[in-house]
Every structure is written in C-alpha cells, then in structure tokens.
Amino acid sequence: NSYYGYYFMINLRPHQAQIVDILKHHSKGQVIVPTGGGKTMCMIKDAQREFNSCSWDVILKDPDRKTIVIVAPRILLAQQLCEDFTKHLEAHHMLQYKVLHVHSGETHYESTTKVNTICDWVKDNYRFNKLIFTTYHSLRRIQQAEIDVDTIYFDEAHNSVQKNFVEATEYFSMYANRCYFFTATPKHSKTPFKIGMNDYDIYGRVLVNVPAPKLVQEGHILPPKVNIRKIDVVDDSRFKHEHDCDHVVSTIDEIDIDKVLICARSTKQIVNLVSQTDFCIELRSRGYSWMYITAKTGAVVDGKKVDRECFFNTLNEWGKDDTKKFV
C-alpha cells in the first residue's frame, strides 16, 4: 500500500545484502568494504528500512520521524552522496522526506551552517523523515544544535580520527541511536594518546570486513594494475607545462583507454596544463572531451564553467556512455 511509505527498487549484491542485514541487528560498528564495493548502496538500503519502520497509524499518533545524518570528508562527496540517496529514495504521497545540507558548499537544497537554523529546520519538519548531509569539518555544527539523531553514517570513516573531528565523532557515537563507520582503509592508533578506529568505545567492533579478493573473484571490482613509465626530468621550469602535456598525451596514446583520470599535484598544475599548453587541442584531435573540478576554480567541462550539479550529471552521463571518450 503506497500510503505506508516509500517504494524502493534496489538490487543488492550478496555482500551488500549481508551488510544491510548486519546493520539491522547492531546499533554501532565498523563496516570495512573495498573501494568500489558499494558502501553507499548499503547506507541507502538501511535508510530506506529506517524510513519505513513506522506504520501510518503510529505516525498519526506520533508524527516524529527519523533523522539520518550522512558525513563525508569533502563538500563534493557530500553533494554526490545526496544525489545518490535522493535518486534511489522515491517518496510516495504524504511520507516525503526533507533534505538539509550543513556545509559551506553550493546546493539547490536548503543549506546552512548556523546552529539555530539547524534547530529550526528540524522543528519545522518534525512530520517528515529527514536527511542531513554534512562534512567532518561541519559536523560539530550539528553537535552544537543538539538535535536527536536516529542514525548517522560516517563515509570514509578513517578521516574521523583527525584531531579536529574526534570530539564530534565521539559525541554522535554516544548519543545517536545508531552509528556506523564505513571505510576501505581503517586507521588504527598504536598509542593511547591518539584516537584510532581500534578505540572500540567510540567506533564499536568491526561488524563486517569484506575481502577485496572475494569481490574481484565475483567480478564486482577490478584488481589494480600498475604500469610505471620513466620520464626525463626537466630542470627549466619554463618548459615544465609542455613536458607535462607531452608526457600525459603520450601515455594516453599508449594505453588507448576511452576514459582517463589524471591526478595532479595541485590546482595550479591542472590550470597550467589546460591553459598554457596544447593539451586540450591534442585531446580534441583524438576525440576526447575533458573536464576538471577543484575547490579553487570550480567545475569546467570542455572549457565551459558549470556548476557542480551539472559537472556530476555530465560525469555520470559520460561514464555510462560506452562510446564517449573523456579525460
């Protein structure tokens, strides 16, 4: 009956179904999943179950709904998580959910870093399920708001052990009804003077640890393959950008891959590559589009400045297109 909540069509892989079932029976703990193993879908499926946990009769008597917080290490990832959640959570009739972002980034959803505004938003939307997306830097704002949190997911949870984030992490570990730490690379501490994810009072025990070889064997992720290229060092900084261009273009020609990710040392290196060399011309001559995004420059697609939402929509569209070549 559609009046009783949401309708979700999420097909889980076996290890994801195992994780979701484990979360059902534990209120706190660590979920160790290799990169590409689908941690986000586990969060979404668990959130679906939480949103559907009350029947309509109960809601009429007690309209307080679930509040779920999702923590990401960076604003861009918080926005991407929001897109993933909202894409899969389809509301039906009166049981709609509301979305709030607590960080300084741009979003077309309601957004704030003010404690009083967070409190007011929660009170104003008490009849709705609530999703709050934030970063580790801004999590303390939600802590200061002292709102009731039913479930909190820490994405890339190894970031939470940083000195500036420990207080808020410990707070929600203690006061949230359900608290889960998702990561592919748990960070432990060998000294009692520094917090690590082996502090089980804060992080709980490891609920599930999915081995990477298992996912490789089942075809869910690809094993890493490393090819090392030797390049000549250029002492004259005047030619460094051209050297970067020649190196990257020749590598693209050699590997002959349609979709390429380039990791640069800095924003300056990216800007110099696309503006001070023939890199973009070389890409176009080979049938490649190009895009980049940094905190300093914002998002650019084929030389045109776009907003973050357009950037990620384009990235998803190109990524799904087997015929599209892009860097």
Model-assigned labels for residue ranges:
Residues 131-151, 160-167:
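Conserved RecA-like ASCE ATPase "motif II neighborhood" in helicase/translocase motors
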Residues 162-221:
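Post-DEXD/H (motif II) to motif III coupling segment of the RecA-like Helicase ATP-binding lobe
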Residues 26-46:
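Walker A/P-loop
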Residues 114-122, 291-327:
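Conserved helicase ATPase core of P-loop NTP-dependent helicases/translocases
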Residues 67-78, 251-279:
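Conserved strand-helix element at the start of the C-terminal RecA-like helicase core
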Residues 205-266:
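Conserved interdomain linker/interface between the two RecA-like ATPase lobes of SF2 helicase motors
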Residues 8-32:
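Conserved pre-motif I regulatory segment
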Residues 77-111:
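Conserved helix-turn-beta segment of the N-terminal RecA-like "Helicase ATP-binding" lobe
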